[in-house]
């Protein structure tokens, strides 16, 4: 007893947690020391103890134990703030989509990680025995990441493609998820459940395939006598000691090992723990060990190459079925990998940088000499510290020291004030994540319809020379100019000369948007094109009047187009049939006392004037009323005044019939107050009663005037009128017309009445009969209007063209807008115009121009000497269709007859073509081409672009622009007037009241204008600008007649920006046409930030910007689509190729192993491998001479690829904490790399090209025949390797039975039944097992011996020589080089 006690006293007491691996070690030690029986007894006791303790503890888990981390709120807020800034940068085009995705992922990942690290300290302080806390690190159930999801935040999730969803789940499972978060996380969670089920079967199948490959490998000899080995080096700390010792224990040395001159281990000696420790301490030279790779036997393995048997701890027995053991050892942990797969449920974990946060508020100090400035990978400035850096933060009373590890980035400056928990440094992610990089393509889709432009040169990808895939050479912006495309399948007929006017019928097509004017009547369309236009010259104009076209003639106040070619010859260029009216500028108009109500020049929808059309009109404010009333024309006789009905609307053009030429000198307006009420409303006054001013009529209406009330009930509404005036009850004798009222001129009196009065003004007498018997007379006041020719419209236009001799006349006509006795209803607060003064256009018919049925009008804006003048241009032309008839061009006519110029009038009005040279101006991003569509025989799909309302913004005018008071007021009320109100389409001005205000383009200071014009190099601008004209169609869209790409701009699509008059003096940027402007760029001082877009019009004090969205793209990105192409929303715009770290979830587990074993290509070869091979091929042959260098190179390549395969597989298992001995994996890898493919170059007599043969067999055959056999080493997947074995029975029992057996029969293959499976199938004795060698007949052995020795000696001798020769050379040349540089991984196991 005493002895025992004393022994016990000497024992060391270990107080340590024991996990699985420690337990394994303990058991193996116990077996070594005490044997099996004793060990099992000890383990029993341990088990009993464990169960007792577990019963006593009884941990329970309740929902109250899930405590959210307090710092979560502000952390999430912080991250959201950063994301917001990022979003803004992306919007301005400073950051491209991939950067944005990456940064937002990093922001959220860092937040989530920081929360996870806070979790344990938080629990430790508040509740150390919290079951959730204990669960997170005990390893019994769950891990830190799962607990983090319960109490921290769920974080980023992967989507089904393995991509990151950049919307993080901010809640944890305790708080509960919102609907969106729930849907995002569903995928990962479900995948976890499904995967567990699917992967179990996967793992089983993997085991089956592995066993299939290696089932025939059995230990058959003691020593194959190989001299090769694989060197493993413990030096330089390349390999961790744990892995180093694992690799070595149980192996056999291939060479003696010397320590100086002393030999510490001999060849063929098994390595135990003692020897390994000695190697580690001595840091000896690289140790060469034998592995299954180096074994020389073809279809089995020798004891020494295999090493120790893991079960007994001594060399493996002969006859051991090591192949099957290897297959099962690799396959079995697969099930564990499966079960651990998706507990984290698709949560993203990647290696991003960790953050260091300041512990408190204070001033930060560090040694500036130890850091040097750099930028983070997101381009933010930072300091890089190369060694450990101590940072002190001085708060009020205490100093905090923070240690920042080397290779970290400091994000703050010295002496800067930091707030508590502010990020002050980033610690670089560990290197381990570098393996999980993969290349990903990210497509960027366009957010809106529009036209694509880019601001740099673009390469065509070589394979798509004629396609639309382009590579960007440098970082640049892609712009999508907003505007909806509208495809049309017509080929446009470009048979127009420069500056010709052209009817837009030929430019039409079926829109994607249903426009309310498309003609869908096919018969009418066929009728239109039935006559053959091109056969003979004919001037016939097809009659459109029978087309059921819907015409709405909106009136357009002055339509002007932005810029014509800047040739001032246009002033002098008066051709026949064309005349140009210069419009006066504002100053000239201000001198005359013309009221600013404005003259509207009305150009009809399609720009065509018939004879007697109204060209312009002027609404005289004197004839304007606010209230409702009735119009009466003078006396009953003067009825032949021109009324509105007599204007004939012909194809949308108002024109006068000349027969109504009579003039009226006066008309009368009888005011009355009218309220139109819904039928259900309750009225508080009776019919025929008399009310005073401001009487309550209905609940919310009061009368504005006093007088007689008349109530008329119609079907669905009530019309309530209040007539002001006097009421007379006349005697019987008064003869007042029963039906209508009578106008009484001044000076007449009621003769029969008792009191005889003179009437001073005109009055209107109306008889009212409230009941059958009685009636009374209402005498109502009348407003009299005289019509004079006082205001002459001619003052707007210079008198010159009115006396023009080229047969165009303008006449001035006044007409009354309302008919005699017509009641006029004014909507509240709008004024009613009673008389309109019109300018009527007419022209003479002379014999020559008999076909001039119509005139075209358009506005031209021309700058001369810095003044912008607007001209109205009117040309007398013939119909465009008769033009087409004049050109007897077969190809043109062919196109016409096929699908004609389909009359789907999307934009029924005339376009003016201005061609320029076909040269793309890269600087202005405005491609222009002379369009000869006639060369284009095949009908291509042309497209129109329709810009929609929301696409434009405008900069408000500045206060110093002389602006009309109306606009000023409206600006005060609402700074963003809808553009439609204040600015009609580009082309129409502001509404009539403030007609001139937007014409304030001629500055009062002529000098500045010229200065501006010099700056903005005008000549060039005029040649290049593409949008020559804007014309309107009836939807208020602006049509830009560009022959190849028709853009229909909506008024709102443009951003007007008004600049100061003296804007050149102030602004730093000179704005040029076509320039792209990003958002937030100020053009004028104190100008509001603009939307991003392209400048399409520069006036003297304003610019118009077409909205555009910038997308930043980096070099190497692929751009889809051509320059200037129309894109739809959702089209792919750019494809970025970028590397991302794979989500480090154990999605890798089994599939990764399978990927390696089945040799599926994973990703592109790493660059440094190629470089290594190149450098190897350069230097080695130089040292060894050519044949040897390449020979060794080839051998090393095979060895190296095998080693890297083993490392890859080990990595997956180790990452899961599964220990598998290398030799099991090596046996399998040996099988999949042992075949070679005979290549065709060296045709040999033995093998046919394309045959798969064992590597060793090929080498031996080559030596025996003394003839070179050319072959290539191939890597077979395990499935292919199973189907390429020596035995066809084994193959047939694996897959494709019928095919394999049929082929074998045809080829006459012989199965030598060497493996296990063949014998099992045929029911023979299995040729394995440790007692197997007794079965071999002794006499056979004797016979074989002499022969065998001869052979082996012969081969061995030769081979030894070669190999030793290699070896010595190799060692002498390379040992110095290879093992001092980290190219170590060439030879030796490396945990890469």
UniProtKB/Swiss-Prot annotation:
UniProt main location, coarse: plastid
Cofactor binding notes: Binds 1 Zn(2+) ion per subunit.
GO cellular component: chloroplast; DNA-directed RNA polymerase complex; mitochondrion
Positions that bind Zn(2+): 224, 295, 302, 305
Broadest EC class assigned to this enzyme: transferase
Coiled coil segments of this chain: none
Enzyme Commission designation: 2.7.7.6
Spans traversing the lipid bilayer: none
Catalysis performed (reactions): RNA(n) + a ribonucleoside 5'-triphosphate = RNA(n+1) + diphosphate
Name of one Pfam family that matches: RNA_pol_Rpb1_5
Record keywords: Chloroplast, DNA-directed RNA polymerase, Metal-binding, Nucleotidyltransferase, Plastid, Transcription, Transferase, Zinc
Gene3D superfamilies: 1.10.132.30, 1.10.150.390, 1.10.1790.20, RNA polymerase Rpb1, domain 3
Family matches, as InterPro entries: DNA-dir_RpoC2_beta_pp, RNA_pol_beta''_euk, RNA_pol_Rpb1_3_sf, RNA_pol_Rpb1_4, RNA_pol_Rpb1_5, Rpb1_funnel_sf
Required cofactor(s): Zn(2+)
One Gene Ontology biological process: DNA-templated transcription
Subcellular location as annotated: Plastid, Chloroplast
GO molecular-function term, one example from the UniProt record: DNA-directed RNA polymerase activity
Similarity comment: Belongs to the RNA polymerase beta' chain family. RpoC2 subfamily.
PANTHER family in UniProt: DNA-DIRECTED RNA POLYMERASE SUBUNIT BETA
Assembly: In plastids the minimal PEP RNA polymerase catalytic core is composed of four subunits: alpha, beta, beta', and beta''. When a (nuclear-encoded) sigma factor is associated with the core the holoenzyme is formed, which can initiate transcription.
Stored NCBIfam families: rpoC2_cyan
Function, as annotated: DNA-dependent RNA polymerase catalyzes the transcription of DNA into RNA using the four ribonucleoside triphosphates as substrates.
Name the UniProt record assigns to this protein: DNA-directed RNA polymerase subunit beta''
Organism, scientific name: Solanum bulbocastanum
